[in-house]
Amino acid sequence: LYTIPTFQNPTGIVMPMPRRKKLLQYCNEMHIPIIEDDVFRDLWLDAPPPPPIKSLDGHGNVVYISSLSKCFAPGLRLGWLVGPEAVVQRLADVKMQMDYGVSVLTQQVAEELLRTGLYEKGVQNIRSQLTERRDFMIRLLERYFSEFAEWSVPSGSFFVWVRLKNRVSAEKLFNLALKEKLLIMPGGVYDRGHSSS
């Protein structure tokens, strides 16, 4: 089972702790491994999110993945995973076959950022900017869209999931927005089962 329980893309939803526990319990009972993608964790704006599902994992059933790319530096293509040793070893082998591993320089830059506190300082600055941008976006939505749409104020990351009250051609809306230099992603992009309206 693959999940983004913290600031899920595209909805921005955070899975509450009781649901995390219930999901882990169910997957343990059914022998279903969990891949927890937690790349947005450090982009909380209002309050830190619940601990990762991996922190509750006493059976080695969760593979936890994260990265510096989403929260800090998109160009710093470095990620990591935590999981059972056999899984980690196998995935490391696959990674080596694909691209011979991550640059040593990239790893040294990441180590320096994390060791010196520069990462946390930078993320605090990013959180501050994201909070301003989120608040600005919500003000614009309230001012211009409140009669046409509904949304939730995200508590982290950079996603605002907007639900239109009336049926609209998502493709047409996408193209009109693009002409105004505004990028929106229709919900159907994220779900094969939904139509483009």
Name every feature range the model reports, one short phrase each.
Residues 2-197:
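PLP-dependent class I/II
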